[in-house]
Each structure stands twice: as structure tokens, then as C-alpha cells.
Amino acid sequence: MCLETTLTKNKTLALINQGYQVLAEYEMIEQKKLRGIYAIPSYSSLLLWFGVIFIHSGMYSESAFRFSILLPDNFPDENCLPTVIFQKDIFHPHICPISHSLDLSPVFKDWHKDQHHIWHILKYIQAIFADPEGSVCNTHNGEPIPLTDVNNMEAMRLLANNRVDFALRAKASIVWSWKHMFDKPPINDPHYIIFERYRPEKHQAMMKRIKSSSWYSLPTSTSPPSTCVARIESARQLLAEEEAQTRGFHSLEMVE
């Protein structure tokens, strides 16, 4: 078997193995049953995740913020940290006002696949909004965070010296986010998390079912299901792909 075929085989098997590991990360998130925060791999790439967080208390109460998670090419084997990018105009000491990236260094120095998982990132995202002051106090080692090490110095200054103004800026972030929550998706991906405005003719039947004490026993609608906007490949599909790839490699070896 030629070197080129071997390299192609190894690369494909590595991608399949990575797919299993990313799927395992998603399943762990489901098992943790995190409330108010959701994330799912995109349809086009397992290394791009779409997420949204809903906050019900504190300075960011009644808010919903979108974010994306970008995993390194060799995830989870690289020590390089994933990248979390929020939508624009979210005022927080740990979120860069230019790149909109979240600073993960207060809780992650490096990424270690035997210690860290994507659900840890989601918990950290919840923590920075639930307790902004606490999130800028200590690093992962329990040491104080230097004031010069935060992503947004203006947010840090207001949080430390003028909570009223900080709360107003946080409120502005919330208003902006809700204003753009129903915008057309910026990417053509069926896994992008989509929100629709409430329409009685479409949503009232489901609301009645949810409010019913025995809604599980109510008759199911016979109308066709809506287009899925949050689907990932199942383990069975990944296994079928792996078996198909393996059969292809065996065929190549026999030809050579």
C-alpha cells in the first residue's frame, strides 16, 4: 500500500475518532442537565458549536446571549484552549469589546482532555453572568486576578467603582441582544439555534399541552414535524461511516 493511501487512511480514521469524542462531549452535556444554557455542534463542522444562555437573576437578569465555541483542529488532544465568541455588545470584564471573545484563563490554564470538558466551559459561562464580581476575583489557582488581565478594563473599572453605571451598561447589552434575537441566521447551518416570535396560531396548542398536568397523555398532532434545527449525527451513523471507510480501505489494499 502506498504512503499516500496510508496517510489518507490515518487521517480519515482520526477524523472518525474525533467525531466520537465530540459526540461524547455532547452526550455529557445532556447528562449534566445544565439549566438555562444550551450548546450543540454545527451540522457542517463538529469543531464549531452554537450556544445560547438564558439568565434569570442578577445584573444580567432576563437576558439571552448567543455564543459560539470553536474547538482546536486536533481537539481534544491539543492543550490549546477552545475559543468562545459572544455576539456583539455584551458588556462584561471577561468579554473583549473588540473580538467579543471570552477569557477562559481564570479557570483554564491549558486544556487536558482527562480533566476538562465542554460542559465545564458552559458552567463557567453561567458563573461569569451569575456573579460578575466573583468571576474577576480569583484564578483557577485561587489567586487574585490582576486588574490588567481582564478583557474589558472599562467594565472592570465600573464594576469596581460604579455599580449603577455598570448595571446600566449590562442592561444595554440585554436590550441589544433581545433586539437581534430574531435576526436572520448569519450562517446557513441547520443546527443554528433559531428563535421565533410567539404566534398564537402556531404555538398556542403546545402552550396548552405544557400547562396541562397530564400533557403526556394528550393526543399528538398528526401534522408533519417541523424542520429540525438542532440535530447531530448519532453514534449509529458514525459507526456506519466508520465501517464504510474501513471497507473502502480494505478494497484499496486488495487492489494494490
Curated annotation (Swiss-Prot):
Residues 17-179 form the UBC core domain. It holds the Pfam family UQ_con. It comes from the Eukaryota. Belongs to the ubiquitin-conjugating enzyme family. FTS subfamily. Signal peptide: none annotated. This is Protein crossbronx-like. The lineage of its organism: Eukaryota, Metazoa, Ecdysozoa, Arthropoda, Hexapoda. InterPro entries: UBQ-conjugat_E2_core, UBQ-conjugating_enzyme/RWD.
